[in-house]
């Protein structure tokens, strides 16, 4: 298929969409998804390379590399690799090896991956990513869930996996579309799972914003949910509203206050002036990469060496999706919505759906179980993991898959 001409505007106009066809599921409705494959126009790739070749690098103060943000020397090499050696087409091919679809829901064209599980009775499972991630985060996790026997696990633990791009993120973004907060995203995903794909009962898993989406599903649609699995606990993030009742809570409150003081600046600007920042990051690929890469380094279990955990290709596949779709500004909206909405996850919200949680040691916040139990009243599994960080599906896909299997094994028939 010949690429459409690229006019220099983002998001690029060259999405390749195959003819409509029904997706696997228990029942279909009039909302028929269309099969989808990603294809960025050659002209958009050339435009990116040209922009990278003209990168204007900032000065850097003397001192420890990464002490003030993204390190200049590392970033210069990363930009060179992106311009000269990175193979975007290989990443497209990898993503396109998974069945993808688009369906119009709530006024947007929602993109999602849907992989039916192996075996006779795979359980439906929704995976929700966060910021600054994308569906690329889950590509190593998906086959471990849909075909566990291939990885030495029990084939009876198979899931049929659905991975949407969050509205306003990546391939679920088009210029001018409505912005979605967490409540609206959860409602959209519930409609996808039940009204479009026909899953009357399903599980949900997520970290970062995905953990809040998952919690919201448990609050709003408990009758549909078989279970919830979280790799970030979405409670106890507001230091002003917390008072320590135990030594463990006191320790956590100190850690939270230190993190908010030194690490939360990104959230303040994304939550107060998202449009201002969007101009810079939508126009400069190096600026976009710097903004995202610094978080992958700071939030992962990499001991300061980001390339010991992620390859450059993994990082650039995710960054590239933000770049080519022009979705970075829209992706900030959950931060703005959270600061300007009365809806929060706190002890006034009670989740009764069976819940499991993995605490990875380098997660950005790790509330103690006593705080979690104020909201999640049926915690079936609480696991403290030996290694890993915020991007668990990328950092520790096998460990995360095993935890998900263990939680849902007894819940499939409840």
Predicted regions and their residues:
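Short beta-strand element of the alpha/beta-hydrolase
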Residues: 122-130
